[in-house]
Regions:
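Short, charged beta-turn/beta-strand-edge "cap" motif at the junction between a beta-strand
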Residues: 278-282
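Intrinsic low-complexity, glycine/proline- and repeat-rich
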Residues: 329-365
């Protein structure tokens, strides 16, 4: 059983922002999870089921992550990412484009921790401010204006902090555990913008240096794209980051906008993809699969960021409660400034990467 990455594998992880561990989860754990999924009642949420959480807690993923990252709370729940086979659709996606028009099997490459409300399915009318107000008033809490109390349909707050200086939730690492054959593109696999974690870190640092407002609605990152076909698309990645990954392989939507080509992560049941929080990613349309795409997604945070707060394994905004509740922190503990520090220093929470990070940075200099 593999219990850690080799030095060369860590270099690859540093360069790419992700690494696929083949056979990280034993066949019996894979089978137990699949069996539990088959027996699920319609609408049953399987996230807290032991058959799901064991994919990390009882597999080699735990020792690998403990060595690579450091101590973390064992997940008590997870995201069950199941995508049925579908054809390209007419509906507007969260970026404000029709699903059928998005390249790369409908990829909507994004950073986690960002509020998402159901995309308007009609072209929006009015001024930009009117569109903004109407969109955020359509969320589950109604019209609260621009406020950290505003919640998305994904139960992520508009802002993490009361002062509205942090527009993204954050954590340390993703683990995507594969339970279906995703060895061929077009089967709904997770895709990642390879190497973009470095650009994202630099962008956060730039925002910090300008006015210490990080994420959407900070410098250089508007919340909404009013030029999208429905006039109300979410800006999931700032243009400054996106444009660094436009090249001759980039495909365009009908309006001529080019989109960075993400890497489709090809995996087989039992494989696990480890990725940094900073790595932009997306699910894709399961257009060519022979079965539903099944990825079980975990979000882990190094314990040193908040030793007294338990992270449940699924939340992308653990400085707030799962449903956006305000958490209690001891005096002198500013959780949002701690998270900003981690966002601007992406390797701070990767204990097992320090030697490689020092080596790679010395080469760059």
């Amino acid at each position: 059983m593999k219990t850690q990455l080799t030095h060369d594998e860590k270099i690859q992880f540093y360069d790419d922002g992700y690494f696929v561990v083949k056979g990280a989860v034993a066949p019996d754990l894979v089978e137990a999870a699949l069996t539990r999924m088959k027996s699920a009642r319609k609408g049953e949420f399987l996230g807290p089921d032991q058959a799901m959480t064991d994919l990390v807690n009882a597999s080699s993923v735990t020792p690998i992550m403990q060595e690579l990252m450091g101590p973390f709370d064992p997940p008590v729940t997870c995201q069950t990412g199941i995508l049925k086979k579908t054809e390209p659709g007419e509906h507007f996606n969260n970026l404000g484009y029709r699903d059928k028009d998005m390249p790369y099997y409908g990829a909507q490459v994004h950073m986690d921790g960002s509020i998402t409300i159901a995309a308007p399915q009609e072209v929006q009318q009015g001024t930009e401010q009117e569109i903004y107000d109407r969109y955020f008033a359509s969320g589950p809490k109604g019209g609260l204006g621009r406020s950290p109390e505003v919640m998305g349909n994904n139960m992520v707050p508009m802002f993490e902090d009361p002062e509205m200086t942090l527009g993204l939730g954050s954590f340390t690492a993703f683990v995507f555990v594969c339970l279906s054959d995703q060895s061929i593109e077009g089967r709904g696999q997770t895709c990642l913008l390879k190497g973009a974690h470095h650009a994202v870190e630099r962008f956060f640092q730039k925002q910090r240096d300008i006015n210490n407002c990080l994420g959407p609605e900070g410098p250089g990152w508007p919340r909404l794209d009013y030029a999208a076909p429905n006039r109300c698309g979410l800006v999931y990645l700032p243009e400054e980051v996106r444009n660094q990954f436009i090249d001759e392989t980039s495909e365009a939507t009908p309006d001529g906008r080019k989109w960075p080509r993400p890497t489709q992560v090809l995996m087989e049941p039992g494989d696990a993809c480890i990725a940094t929080y900073h790595t932009p990613h997306s699910g894709t349309r399961n257009e060519l699969g022979t079965e539903s795409r099944k990825n079980i997604i975990f979000r882990l945070r190094h314990k040193k960021r908040q030793p007294n707060i338990q992270v449940n394994g699924v939340s992308d905004h653990p400085d707030r409660g799962q449903m956006g509740e305000w958490l209690a922190f001891e005096e002198g503990n500013d959780p949002w400034e701690r998270s900003k520090f981690a966002m601007c220093n992406q390797w701070h929470e990767w204990d097992g990467m320090q030697e490689v990070v020092a080596q790679m940075r010395s080469r760059a200099n």
